[in-house]
């Protein structure tokens, strides 16, 4: 988890994501992502969440090709993150992305939720 993360804004992005407002979640995370060192772990963390949100946005708009490309990017980025699975459910998100890549039909009955527990 980035040390300088604005936890209030991150929580708002999570709320957008979990409410199915994937475009809004992506926009919010992207604002922070742009300021991260390219290819740093923080960069990969935010890129993974952004790509996951955009993949689900593409799915909602019947863009199968875009969904598949962004799911792959999301998984690649999330797999580059070694943060402990303490504040965000990274292992569950990675697992869901793997399953959705193998069988896109799961998106019809199971969408991921980001579980975020801010630090004390």
Predicted regions and their residues:
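Terminal, low-structured helical/coil segments at or just beyond the last alpha-helical repeat
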Residues: 95-120
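Residue-level signature for tetratricopeptide repeat
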Residues: 15, 50, 57-58
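Inward-facing hydrophobic residues that define packing positions of alpha-helical scaffold repeats
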Residues: 17, 22, 29-30, 71-72, ...
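Boundary/linker segments of alpha-helical solenoid repeat arrays
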Residues: 38-42, 78-92
